[in-house]
């Protein structure tokens, strides 16, 4: 009887320059890992889903990679890192469109790249570019333009959110609770400007100007702009509610520390107090901000029901009226789902930035 080829479970993730594969095999012995003709070959003795056996698999990559994989054995798995030949984002891992049954995305790894790692990587890239340009005798025009552009972008955002934060603070100190009810008419124009400009941040990540992951930036951009432009912007009845003050105040409180931190990073400055604030203040502010957004959605539901705005009727023969409030109720669930995902991501950022007790690997 011919022996059946056993394949282990493999999880993958990527960055612009690297591919990461996690092979679910424990107590691995005699691993044979190589890349020939752009195909990754893996064969090893280990304990997997089918017990202690020899497992193997082959993956033909979507695009060209460097033929020197780097792997690390742990007690529970094999971690493989493969360098892409061209720094770019792949739409899938393999050349064949149909994903192999043993292959799945490593969702934790897709969201784990922290700001601290990105800073170190950016600095290392900058150092290597500087050495290369010096050896070639070329000016650092592109590097300086990129740093100057990012510095100015973060400076403008910092000034915009600082104006909102200071304005709301001063008005509250002078007028007290009365300042809550005209917050929108006082600072909405500046908030519109800052949030429209935030689109650039997501574009920068998508095209590789920055090494930030696209997904967290996109989630925050879409969530905030939905609250600002749909909930507040289209409903005059919502614009004089106190919740607008709390949403705008919490957003600006978070961003003045985030953008000032990024701004100083562009000029290679590290102010430890600011760094600590950037990686700590989100712990109370981020959940409070999500809670304020949820309150604004809840308060808007009866208004949308009453006005019928954005509601529509399905065509014949169904002819069912679909209220916009139905989508708002779904959005409420998405707010708290996003809170969980981003809170977990931000916690890992902070833990990696300030270190953790290292677990002993046998």
Curated annotation (Swiss-Prot):
<dbReference type="GO" id="GO:0016601">
    <property type="term" value="P:Rac protein signal transduction"/>
</dbReference>
<feature type="topological domain" description="Cytoplasmic">
    <location>
        <begin position="344"/>
        <end position="362"/>
    </location>
</feature>
<keyword id="KW-0456">Lyase</keyword>
<keyword id="KW-0275">Fatty acid biosynthesis</keyword>
<keyword id="KW-0444">Lipid biosynthesis</keyword>
<feature type="transmembrane region" description="Helical">
    <location>
        <begin position="280"/>
        <end position="298"/>
    </location>
</feature>
<dbReference type="GO" id="GO:0007266">
    <property type="term" value="P:Rho protein signal transduction"/>
</dbReference>
<keyword id="KW-0812">Transmembrane</keyword>
<feature type="coiled-coil region">
    <location>
        <begin position="111"/>
        <end position="136"/>
    </location>
</feature>
<feature type="active site">
    <location>
        <position position="293"/>
    </location>
</feature>
<keyword id="KW-1133">Transmembrane helix</keyword>
<dbReference type="GO" id="GO:0005925">
    <property type="term" value="C:focal adhesion"/>
</dbReference>
<keyword id="KW-0007">Acetylation</keyword>
<dbReference type="InterPro" id="IPR007052">
    <property type="entry name" value="CS_dom"/>
</dbReference>
<keyword id="KW-0443">Lipid metabolism</keyword>
<feature type="topological domain" description="Lumenal">
    <location>
        <begin position="236"/>
        <end position="241"/>
    </location>
</feature>
<dbReference type="GO" id="GO:0007264">
    <property type="term" value="P:small GTPase-mediated signal transduction"/>
</dbReference>
<feature type="topological domain" description="Lumenal">
    <location>
        <begin position="299"/>
        <end position="322"/>
    </location>
</feature>
<dbReference type="GO" id="GO:0030148">
    <property type="term" value="P:sphingolipid biosynthetic process"/>
</dbReference>
<dbReference type="GO" id="GO:0005096">
    <property type="term" value="F:GTPase activator activity"/>
</dbReference>
<dbReference type="InterPro" id="IPR008978">
    <property type="entry name" value="HSP20-like_chaperone"/>
</dbReference>
<protein>
    <recommendedName>
        <fullName>Very-long-chain (3R)-3-hydroxyacyl-CoA dehydratase 3</fullName>
        <ecNumber>4.2.1.134</ecNumber>
    </recommendedName>
</protein>
<keyword id="KW-0472">Membrane</keyword>
<feature type="modified residue" description="Phosphoserine">
    <location>
        <position position="135"/>
    </location>
</feature>
<dbReference type="GO" id="GO:0102158">
    <property type="term" value="F:very-long-chain (3R)-3-hydroxyacyl-CoA dehydratase activity"/>
</dbReference>
<dbReference type="GO" id="GO:0031965">
    <property type="term" value="C:nuclear membrane"/>
</dbReference>
<dbReference type="GO" id="GO:0019899">
    <property type="term" value="F:enzyme binding"/>
</dbReference>
<feature type="transmembrane region" description="Helical">
    <location>
        <begin position="186"/>
        <end position="207"/>
    </location>
</feature>
<feature type="transmembrane region" description="Helical">
    <location>
        <begin position="150"/>
        <end position="170"/>
    </location>
</feature>
<feature type="topological domain" description="Cytoplasmic">
    <location>
        <begin position="208"/>
        <end position="217"/>
    </location>
</feature>
<comment type="subunit">
    <text>May interact with enzymes of the ELO family (including ELOVL1); with those enzymes that mediate condensation, the first of the four steps of the reaction cycle responsible for fatty acids elongation, may be part of a larger fatty acids elongase complex. Interacts with RAC1. Associates with internalized insulin receptor/INSR complexes on Golgi/endosomal membranes; HACD3/PTPLAD1 together with ATIC and PRKAA2/AMPK2 is proposed to be part of a signaling network regulating INSR autophosphorylation and endocytosis.</text>
</comment>
<feature type="transmembrane region" description="Helical">
    <location>
        <begin position="218"/>
        <end position="235"/>
    </location>
</feature>
<dbReference type="GO" id="GO:0005783">
    <property type="term" value="C:endoplasmic reticulum"/>
</dbReference>
<keyword id="KW-0276">Fatty acid metabolism</keyword>
<dbReference type="GO" id="GO:0030497">
    <property type="term" value="P:fatty acid elongation"/>
</dbReference>
<dbReference type="GO" id="GO:0007254">
    <property type="term" value="P:JNK cascade"/>
</dbReference>
<feature type="transmembrane region" description="Helical">
    <location>
        <begin position="242"/>
        <end position="256"/>
    </location>
</feature>
<feature type="domain" description="CS">
    <location>
        <begin position="5"/>
        <end position="94"/>
    </location>
</feature>
<comment type="pathway">
    <text>Lipid metabolism; fatty acid biosynthesis.</text>
</comment>
<dbReference type="GO" id="GO:0007249">
    <property type="term" value="P:canonical NF-kappaB signal transduction"/>
</dbReference>
<dbReference type="GO" id="GO:0045070">
    <property type="term" value="P:positive regulation of viral genome replication"/>
</dbReference>
<dbReference type="GO" id="GO:0042761">
    <property type="term" value="P:very long-chain fatty acid biosynthetic process"/>
</dbReference>
């Amino acid at each position: 009887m011919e022996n059946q080829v056993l394949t282990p479970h493999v999880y993958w993730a990527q960055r612009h320059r690297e591919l990461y594969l996690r092979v679910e095999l424990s107590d691995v012995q005699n691993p044979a890992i190589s890349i020939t003709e752009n195909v990754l070959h893996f064969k090893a003795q280990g304990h997997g889903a089918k017990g202690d056996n020899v497992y193997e698999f082959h993956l033909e990559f979507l695009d060209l990679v460097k033929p020197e994989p780097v792997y690390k054995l742990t007690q529970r798995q094999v971690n493989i890192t493969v360098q892409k030949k061209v720094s770019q984002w792949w739409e899938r891992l393999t050349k064949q469109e149909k994903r192999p049954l043993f292959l799945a995305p490593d969702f934790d790894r897709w969201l784990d790249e922290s700001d601290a790692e990105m800073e170190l990587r950016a600095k290392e890239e900058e150092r290597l570019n500087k050495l290369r340009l010096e050896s070639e005798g070329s000016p650092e025009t592109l590097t300086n333009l990129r740093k100057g552009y990012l510095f100015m972008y973060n400076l403008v955002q910092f000034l915009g959110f600082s104006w909102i934060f200071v304005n709301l603070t001063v008005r509250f100190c002078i007028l007290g609770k009365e300042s809550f009810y005209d917050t929108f008419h006082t600072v909405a124009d500046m908030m519109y400007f800052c949030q429209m400009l935030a689109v650039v941040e997501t574009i920068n990540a998508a095209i590789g100007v920055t090494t930030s992951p696209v997904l967290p930036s996109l989630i925050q951009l879409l969530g905030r702009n939905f609250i600002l432009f749909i909930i507040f912007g289209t409903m005059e009845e919502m614009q004089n509610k106190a919740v607008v003050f709390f949403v705008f105040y919490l957003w600006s409180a978070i961003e003045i520390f985030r953008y000032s931190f990024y701004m100083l990073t562009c000029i290679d400055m590290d102010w430890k107090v600011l760094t600590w604030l950037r990686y700590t203040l989100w712990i109370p502010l981020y959940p409070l901000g999500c809670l304020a957004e949820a309150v604004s959605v809840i308060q808007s539901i009866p208004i949308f029901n009453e006005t019928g705005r954005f509601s529509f009727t399905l065509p014949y023969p169904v002819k069912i009226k679909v209220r916009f409030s139905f989508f708002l109720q779904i959005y409420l669930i998405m707010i708290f789902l996003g809170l969980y995902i981003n809170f977990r991501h931000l916690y890992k950022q902070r833990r990696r930035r300030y270190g953790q007790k290292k677990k002993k690997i046998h």
